[in-house]
């Protein structure tokens, strides 16, 4: 969140981000970068415009997180649940994506796979204990199960 806040306060820096950068804002963090949005459609359109202008990938976190490419493609992730809206969950997402990038996955694939696995781990955690009180470490604990589910 700190890096996104810095970018929001220094918007010119968005154009200096390295190729392959991925931003993972939630709706309010995105609005700090692009201005207030009237509805979710406008928010999505502004995120697409930002991804294109800054030549970055954006994962707009939410009920159905949107993965947006610099070319304007938009993919919606079907996994995840409201219990994942907890401190540290975005850090877990970042860690999953970075692990995929470190293995050589292309940026777009790492963003899509990482978002899916992260959400699936959250869904596994929800089934185990429910949404209320879910914390980031619950998602981490369920990552191996999520990977196993997609490999079967």
Q: Where in the sequence are the language-model features?
A:
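Short glycine/serine- and small hydrophobic-enriched flexible loop segments
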Residues: 95-103, 116-124, 145
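Short glycine/threonine-rich catalytic loop with a Thr-x-Gly-x-Asp
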Residues: 80-97, 107, 132
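Glycine-rich phosphate/dinucleotide-binding loop and adjoining beta-alpha-beta core of small-molecule
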Residues: 1-79
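Charged C-terminal helix
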Residues: 122-152
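N-terminal loops that bind phosphate or other acidic moieties
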Residues: 19, 72, 104-105, 129, ...
């Amino acid at each position: 969140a700190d890096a996104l806040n810095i970018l929001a306060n220094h918007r010119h820096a968005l154009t200096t981000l390295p190729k392959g950068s991925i931003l993972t804002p939630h709706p309010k963090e995105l609005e700090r970068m692009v201005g207030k949005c009237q509805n979710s459609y406008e928010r999505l359109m502004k995120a697409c415009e930002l991804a294109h202008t800054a030549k970055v990938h954006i994962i707009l976190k939410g009920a159905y997180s949107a993965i947006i490419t610099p070319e304007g493609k938009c993919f919606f992730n079907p996994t995840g649940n409201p219990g994942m809206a907890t401190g540290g969950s975005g850090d877990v997402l970042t860690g999953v994506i970075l692990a995929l990038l470190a293995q050589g996955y292309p940026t777009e694939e790492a963003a899509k796979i990482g978002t899916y696995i992260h959400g699936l781990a959250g869904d596994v955690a929800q089934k185990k204990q429910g949404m209320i009180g879910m914390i980031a470490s619950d998602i981490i604990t369920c990552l191996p199960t999520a990977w196993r589910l997609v490999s079967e």
